[in-house]
C-alpha cells in the first residue's frame, strides 16, 4: 500500500475560521458541560496559547468517556483543508512520549491487510497489569493515536500510547468507527488530528484530544473536537509512572 507521509513537526492553528455544521455524536456517548476551570495541561508538540486555554476548560472526569472541546469545532485552518492524503507523526520526546499525530484520511490510506503484532512496542509508562473489573482483564492497551482501521499503521512507536481499555474502546473507538464508515461510504477525505495530553513530566497521558473535519463537504459529514479521558472506572492510576491500584470502593 503506497502512502504519502509528511515529515517534520506539526503546528497547531489558532482558531477554526469556518464553523462546522451540526453533527450527531456517537450514540451512547453524552457530552459534558464545562463545570469549572481545570489546571493547565501541557502536551508534547507545538501548541498555541489560545489552544492551551481551550484545553484548560476541560472539566475533570465525571462518568463520561469524553468532553466536547471548543463547541465541537476543530482548530483547522482553510489552508489545512486538502484532498491529498497523507500521514504525519511527531518524533518521540526525550522521555519516549508520543506527540501530535495528524493525517488527511482517505480510502487509499485504509488497510488492505490484517493488523500485524504490535506487542513489541512499549509506549511510555507501559505496565502489564490485570484487574478482574476491567473488560479483557488488562488495564492498558497500546492505543493507536490514528486508529489502524483509518491508516493501517501497525507497530509504529510514534503512533502508540499507553491507554486504558476504557479510553480505547469506550472513548476513542466510536469516533474512529464514525470516521471510517464515512470514508467508506462517501470516498471523501477527513482531516484528522489526535494530540496526547501529558501533564508535566508524566509518562502516561491524562487523555487525548481528537479533532476531525470532512474535507469535500466542509464538515457537513464529519466534524468534532473532543477530549477523551485516559481513565479506567474503579482503578487509580499514577500518571507519572503508569503504576495503578484498585480503588478501595471496588475492593
Where are these regions (language model features)?
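Bacterial signal peptide processing site
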Residues: 21-24
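Bacterial N-terminal signal peptides that target proteins for export
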Residues: 1-9
Amino acid at each position: 500500500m503506497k502512502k504519502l507521509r509528511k515529515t517534520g513537526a506539526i503546528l497547531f492553528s489558532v482558531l477554526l475560521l469556518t464553523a462546522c455544521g451540526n453533527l450527531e455524536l456517537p450514540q451512547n456517548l453524552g457530552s459534558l458541560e464545562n463545570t469549572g476551570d481545570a489546571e493547565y495541561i501541557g502536551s508534547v508538540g507545538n501548541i498555541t496559547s489560545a489552544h492551551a486555554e481551550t484545553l484548560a476548560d476541560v472539566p475533570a472526569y465525571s462518568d463520561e468517556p469524553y468532553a466536547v472541546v471548543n463547541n465541537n469545532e476543530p482548530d483547522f485552518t482553510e489552508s489545512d483543508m486538502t484532498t491529498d492524503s497523507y500521514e504525519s507523526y511527531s518524533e518521540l520526546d526525550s522521555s519516549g512520549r508520543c506527540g501530535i499525530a495528524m493525517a488527511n484520511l482517505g480510502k487509499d490510506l485504509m488497510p488492505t491487510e490484517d493488523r500485524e503484532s504490535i506487542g513489541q512496542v512499549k509506549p511510555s509508562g507501559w505496565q502489564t497489569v490485570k484487574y478482574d473489573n476491567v473488560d479483557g482483564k488488562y488495564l492498558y492497551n497500546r492505543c493507536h493515536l490514528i486508529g489502524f482501521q483509518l491508516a493501517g499503521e501497525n507497530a509504529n512507536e510514534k503512533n502508540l500510547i499507553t491507554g486504558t481499555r476504557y479510553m480505547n474502546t469506550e472513548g476513542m473507538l466510536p469516533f474512529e468507527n464514525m470516521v471510517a464508515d464515512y470514508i467508506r461510504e462517501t470516498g471523501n477525505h477527513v482531516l484528522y488530528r489526535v494530540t496526547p495530553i501529558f501533564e508535566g513530566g508524566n509518562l502516561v497521558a491524562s487523555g487525548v484530544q481528537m479533532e476531525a473535519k470532512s474535507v469535500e463537504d466542509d464538515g457537513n459529514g464529519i466534524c468534532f473536537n473532543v477530549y477523551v479521558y485516559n481513565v479506567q472506572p474503579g482503578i487509580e492510576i499514577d500518571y507519572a509512572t503508569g503504576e495503578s491500584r484498585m480503588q478501595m470502593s471496588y475492593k
